[in-house]
Amino acid sequence: MRRLLVPTLAVSLTALIALPFVVLLMQSLARSWSYPALWPQRWQLEQWLVLGAAWPSLAAAAWRSLVLALLVALVATGAGFFTSRALTRSALRQRWLALALLPFAVPPVVYALSLAQAYAALGLNGHYGGVLLAQLPFAYGYAVLLCRGYWTRHSRALDELALSLGARPAQVWWRVHLPLARGLLGVCLFQTALMSWFDFALVRVIGAGHVETLTLKVFDYLGAGDLRQAAAAALLLLGPPCLALLANPRLLWPPVSRVSS
């Protein structure tokens, strides 16, 4: 029984993960699908043909979404990794951590509406720079939370060892910590990029209709009441993250740091 338990759990988990994608795919190919049928009664490619006709605008939105997500991830991960070291070694680390996580205490829509007036006065509404600045506090707080687990007594011992051997502080960062934290930083980059890639509220409010991302395109189809077209667009939205996970499954969870073992 125990030998069958692990394969059974693995198959069940895989089926649960794959089920939403299968439903989306069937919905995107459905012409008619009524309750209580388990699959569409009639099929068609019309939804995908419509996406093909709209491909230039979708590709442009996907490219802008990707650039925005990469910028948010790079800034948030870099700042989060370097500042989490000072945070974990501070006597007030719990207060600093609470401050870094403060944006998560406010719903994104409320946060965006609170910033909208100030951003309008600064001329940031309707610009990608404004959306970037609005997304950064959330991504940075998450990066700090994720990276602080790297800074343990062992990492401090490595600091002292490298410095005692004549390494400069910059060399300790580049030759010791960055190589050891490479896996963790990859996870942090991927997950903070996803926060920007799937963001809707901040892009909608701060972007003020002038910032187009692929997520907004999906919600536009939903707003139009075309669930089949929205399902096809949602598969396009999920495609890049899924391809990244297939290429490197370790992006899904933080690795156990070698300095903490």
Language-model-detected regions and their locations in the chain:
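Membrane-water interface segments at the C-terminal ends of transmembrane alpha-helices
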Residues: 2-34, 49-152, 180, 184-200, ...
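Short cytosolic juxtamembrane segments of multi-pass membrane proteins
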Residues: 251-261
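Short glycine/proline-centered loop/turn elements that form peptide/ligand docking sites
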Residues: 153-158, 257
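Short alpha-helical segment that forms part of, or immediately flanks, the ligand-binding pocket
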Residues: 134, 159-160
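Luminal/periplasmic active-site loops of membrane-embedded glycosylation enzymes
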Residues: 39-51
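Glycine-rich helix-loop "coupling/hinge" segments at transmembrane-helix boundaries
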Residues: 36-41, 199-228, 261
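Short helix-to-coil transition segments within interhelical loops
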Residues: 160-181
